[in-house]
From Swiss-Prot:
Pfam families listed in its UniProt record: SmpB
Source organism of this protein record: Saccharopolyspora erythraea (strain ATCC 11635 / DSM 40517 / JCM 4748 / NBRC 13426 / NCIMB 8594 / NRRL 2338)
Location within or outside the cell: Cytoplasm
Name of the protein described by the UniProt record: SsrA-binding protein
Originating gene: smpB
Chief location: cytoplasm
Length: 158
């Protein structure tokens, strides 16, 4: 079977950018079992409740749901097991420093295949308060209204 080229999106955490202020992103590899890869190739995964932690110098992805492979047998995986993320040692050390000093969190933004390998886009993020979310919505609405007005002015319907 030929390897896929390019990037194929499997799952995206759409609430992440609403609930968190993303400060930095990292592309990480992920350690998976065979049935997990097959399940992902079917496009099944959920990142909604997912987060990452650093334990003993290793980064672990927790609470991400990859359903059991339907054609799998007794070798099937546990859907919500912890999965190891692959980062360079220097990146892990920088992450540990930022998490400890600032109280930041690691949140998965998307899960995808890149040149046949499963990757996770991991974000270093700070939680938003309710008033921050309202401000962001107000900014989006104002920007949308400006774009509408510009479009009407261009078309001469002003």
């Amino acid at each position: 079977m030929a390897k896929e080229q390019g990037r194929k999106l499997i799952a995206q955490n759409r609430r992440a950018r609403h609930d968190w202020s993303v400060l930095d992103t990292y592309e990480t590899g992920i350690v998976l079992t065979g049935t997990e890869v097959k399940s992902l190739r079917q496009g099944k995964a959920s990142l909604v409740d997912g987060f990452a932690t650093v334990d003993r110098g290793e980064v672990w992805l927790r609470n991400v749901h990859i359903p059991e492979y339907t054609e799998g047998t007794w070798t099937n995986h546990e859907p919500r097991r912890s999965r190891k993320l692959l980062l360079h040692k220097g990146e892990i050390i920088r992450l540990i420093g930022k998490i400890q000093e600032s109280g930041l969190s690691l949140i998965p933004l998307s899960l995808y295949f890149s040149d046949g390998k499963a990757k996770v886009e991991l974000a270093l993020a700070k939680g938003k308060k309710a008033h921050d979310k309202r401000q962001d919505l107000a900014k989006k609405d104002a920007q949308r209204e400006i774009e509408r007005a510009m479009g009407r002015a261009r078309k001469g319907k002003w």
